[in-house]
């Protein structure tokens, strides 16, 4: 289903379904022999979402139909699981470091099925604001409540599309723009138009007190190139056909969800707006540092991304 300016989604459709795939990666990492992260709640979301391609993450072995669709499928799957684990660890470490330095106001943009408010060891007094589509947040909170899981930090759900007036909704939920904030944008930017991405950062800027921090999964202009889009779609179509043979399960065509538009590099934007960029680590370097390097010869296995941290002067 192609995107529209005012589209919405539930957890098992469109952009919402991608959150289940990411939760699947965290669930697989959590039960691995030497996990980088621990997310005991990711599995609960997969089970609660019903039947769908995301349920392959609940099994230790991949279906033969998917493996047969691509001789490199298992290696690609492991690379993406490694990417998800390293990305999760990056943001986990960022938030705990910010809280350790005294920041008590956290805003997770496009929170999806992230469960950091429930699983990280937050210091007393931390408030975690989560912004996402209302149905996505309702599914997450309802699932956790049904398993008697309570948040460790004070948790505030802000159900609103990031293309709408979320700063107003955030303020109405209790956000204090005069206090330093730790912001995150994880797995978000390609789902926004270039203009919407610019507006997102303008709004972060307007709400950030000095001393605020931001962490971003930024994507290079190579990621947004027609060649990269075509390559990803060719791979996805092969997997989609295999998933259908697996039993009618479907894989969303990523090209229908992402916006193929070049945009201002995040590092450049931050530096031009008074932020000190304290880290800008490529996905390859991030993964290699955690012994999750992509095997040589495995092309386009993970997104062309850079993990960026900044502090507002």
From Swiss-Prot:
It comes from Mycobacterium avium (strain 104). Keywords: Methyltransferase, S-adenosyl-L-methionine, Transferase. Its EC number is 2.1.1.-. One of its GO terms (biological process) is methylation. It holds the Pfam family LCM. S-adenosyl-L-methionine binds at residues 132, 161-162. Exhibits S-adenosyl-L-methionine-dependent methyltransferase activity. InterPro entries: Ppm1/Ppm2/Tcmp, SAM-dependent_MTases_sf, SAM_mthyl_Trfase_ML2640-like. The keyword rRNA processing does not apply. This is Putative S-adenosyl-L-methionine-dependent methyltransferase MAV_2576.
